[in-house]
């Protein structure tokens, strides 16, 4: 099985009040195509930091990579410029974030937030993106999905917001889906 993701000796640290601390210490693992891998550990063990490192979504420069390589399809993501990472994020690699209440924009409708991802990465017109958004919301179990298109996040339950986040992550049929406690609110 070919390696889709290969992480080698990843160490991640944070700086706070001039003091450095290590959150992830030389973690290595790989994920093959079609494979499911779970990172298991107690709270604070670095699971989320490891996941966020893959897409360089940590709060840089407070966060820093002390060592390691992150290869996605044999390309070292750690050395890629931001514009390249933007083309990967939400398209080839998607992430279901742990906290849907703060991950959705409170000012935009569910339709806008999901369809925008589809339009941006797939180049579809709004009507086609809207139809795909409706299909995705139905697929993840949103009741009365058509009515929910115009809803703002605060009008949905926590579980429904989590389902919207799952729909967003699946929207572009990513090669790799990272799920950081995806069922927290379900």
Question: Which sequence ranges carry the predicted segments?
Answer:
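Hydrophobic anchor residue at the start of the ABC signature
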Residues: 114, 166, 186
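Conserved ABC ATPase "signature" region
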Residues: 76, 128-147
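A short, proline-enriched helix->beta-strand linker immediately N-terminal to the Walker B motif
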Residues: 171-175
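Catalytic Walker B motif of ABC-type/P-loop ATPase nucleotide-binding domains
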Residues: 177-180
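Conserved ABC transporter NBD signature motif
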Residues: 65-76
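Conserved ABC ATPase signature
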Residues: 151-156, 160
């Amino acid at each position: 099985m070919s390696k889709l993701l290969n992480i080698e000796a990843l160490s991640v640290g944070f700086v706070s009040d001039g003091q450095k601390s290590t959150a992830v210490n030389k973690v290595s693992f790989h994920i093959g195509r079609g494979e499911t891998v779970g990172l298991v550990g107690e709270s604070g063990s670095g699971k989320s930091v490891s996941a966020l490192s893959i897409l360089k979504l940590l709060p840089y420069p407070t966060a820093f990579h002390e060592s390691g390589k992150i290869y996605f399809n044999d390309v070292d993501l750690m050395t890629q410029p931001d514009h390249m990472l933007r083309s990967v994020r939400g398209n080839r690699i998607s992430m279901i974030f742990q906290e849907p209440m703060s991950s959705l924009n409170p000012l935009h409708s569910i339709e806008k937030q999901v369809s925008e991802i589809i339009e941006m990465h797939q180049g579809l017109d709004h009507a086609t993106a809207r139809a795909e958004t409706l299909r995705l919301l139905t697929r993840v179990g949103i009741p009365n999905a058509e009515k929910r298109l115009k809803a703002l996040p605060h009008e949905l339950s926590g579980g429904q917001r989590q389902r919207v986040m799952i729909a967003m992550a699946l929207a572009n049929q990513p090669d790799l889906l990272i799920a950081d406690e995806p069922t927290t609110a379900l």
